[in-house]
Amino acid sequence: MHLNPSEISELIKSRIEGLEATAEVRTQGTVVSVTDGIVRIHGLSDVMQGEMLEFPGNTFGLALNLERDSVGAVVLGEYEHITEGDTVKCTGRILEVPVGEELIGRVVNALGQPIDGKGPITTKHSEPIEKIAPGVVWRQSVNQPVQTGLKAIDAMVPIGRGQRELIIGDRQTGKTAVAVDAIINQKGENMICIYVAIGQKASSISNVVRKLEEHGAMEYTIVVAATASESAAMQFIAPYSGCTMGEYFRDTGRDALIVYDDLTKQAWAYRQISLLLRRPPGREAYPGDVFYLHSRLLERAARVSAAYVEKETNGAVKGKTGSLTALPVIETQAGDVTAFVPTNVISITDGQIFLESDLFNAGIRPAINAGISVSRVGGAAQTKVIKKLGGGVRLALAQYRELAAFAQFASDLDEATRKQLERGKMVTELMKQPQYSTLSVSEMALTLFAVNKGYLDDVEVSRALAFESALRGFIRSKYGAILDKIETTKDLDAETEKELDAAIQDFKKNGTY
């Protein structure tokens, strides 16, 4: 057998050219210690802040502390199987979660994995959980309303699409109830809702999901759950995951509403992680960047311009603005709004709804304190008819609270003061509303119109809610066209006002309550 050297060299050349190098370049490190879900790693010289790290057993972690000779990472999920000496690899990726329509109607964990037993979720896209908020140039002013269906909120502290409105109060004052009612009321409003449950009992979350299903709200809602039994890391990242899911809808020219229930527990989880990472503690043992923790999350809620949507969708969606409205929840201790986290979030948001345990225990539910609850930008977005009729309500309540304090000491009151007190009592009574019974704009307008025009002046306060309910039923059955007109135009012209006047007078003559 004769071998030609040139043939051999050609053969070797072709083999070398056809060779596919399968070696992957990855930075590796070694686990030095594992304590309470915090892992110290030696090596990993090229790791990025917030990068995903791969541990043995298909477990992932986040690199949070980059020190001179070691890396502090937090494990996402179970960490019992990780031991000293294990190999850790860099992934070169920032933590991402799945986004898209496929998530609607599902319950997922902080990593976007389904936990409702309804099978896997296959989405076309995934996005990083940490994103920079849209700049000032890409934003638009808030001028479209978010109807919560609650009289006290829509009349006194209106919320607009793209606003951040804080719901703050002690435990057991109905904070979750207000947020869930707001979600239920978005039926048919073309609004995708995301409910992020942080550090709550699994049973409480399952109750909320059941209620949302009963009212048909899961058809447009995503639930992101990081229960109390999950690690602090999962509770810390859950709000960012939910926000990314909401941003997908905002950036495709749609409207989304996100509820963070609640951010106090996220701050606690972050404090726990920071202390375990040996970061220096500050006020109330929180780390120095706890303000940034919430500000970078809440700044992502915005109303964005059509140009921004066009840029984000590469020209696929034109002429549509998008919005992400945030309702963060904060729990206070004994009504103390001057604590560290409450003051931080109050200063970040565009207003707050303050719920008081005294009002709640007195049977005034939703227990909204009209005096210190404000909406800084929602007024421009308020529905015209509610704006016209609701102005007097806030004033009546504010004056009533003031006068009621004085009236305790005064024995004889003049007629005007007595009338004002009676009116305040009536308005307070009418602002009460049972849970899961949200009202449409026209139904709300009807109540406000009746109280403003003095149709309830001769009604006993204890019969006010019965009067309101009977009036609603009477008008809907006999004068339904008036309500439909208000619902369509979202305004009250002189002609409709006359018709409504006549209709209520008819009810007072012939109706029963």
Swiss-Prot record:
It is a peripheral membrane protein. F-type ATPases have 2 components, CF(1) - the catalytic core - and CF(0) - the membrane proton channel. CF(1) has five subunits: alpha(3), beta(3), gamma(1), delta(1), epsilon(1). CF(0) has three main subunits: a(1), b(2) and c(9-12). The alpha and beta chains form an alternating ring which encloses part of the gamma chain. CF(1) is attached to CF(0) by a central stalk formed by the gamma and epsilon chains, while a peripheral stalk is formed by the delta and b chains. SUPFAM superfamilies: C-terminal domain of alpha and beta subunits of F1 ATP synthase, N-terminal domain of alpha and beta subunits of F1 ATP synthase, P-loop containing nucleoside triphosphate hydrolases. Produces ATP from ADP in the presence of a proton gradient across the membrane. The alpha chain is a regulatory subunit. GO terms for molecular function: ADP binding; ATP binding; proton-transporting ATP synthase activity, rotational mechanism. It comes from Nitrosospira multiformis (strain ATCC 25196 / NCIMB 11849 / C 71). Keywords: ATP synthesis, ATP-binding, Cell inner membrane, Cell membrane, CF(1), Hydrogen ion transport, Ion transport, Membrane, Nucleotide-binding, Translocase, Transport. The record marks S373 as: Required for activity. The keyword Membrane applies. It is found in: Cell inner membrane. Its EC number is 7.1.2.2. InterPro entries: ATP_synth_asu-like_sf, ATP_synth_asu_C, ATP_synth_asu_C_sf, ATP_synth_F1_a_nt-bd_dom, ATP_synth_F1_asu, ATPase_a/bsu_AS, ATPase_F1/V1/A1_a/bsu_N, ATPase_F1/V1/A1_a/bsu_N_sf. Belongs to the ATPase alpha/beta chains family. PANTHER family: ATP SYNTHASE SUBUNIT ALPHA, MITOCHONDRIAL. CDD domains: ATP-synt_F1_alpha_C, ATP-synt_F1_alpha_N, F1-ATPase_alpha_CD. It catalyses: ATP + H2O + 4 H(+)(in) = ADP + phosphate + 5 H(+)(out). Gene3D superfamilies: 2.40.30.20, ATP synthase alpha/beta chain, C-terminal domain, P-loop containing nucleotide triphosphate hydrolases. This is ATP synthase subunit alpha 1.
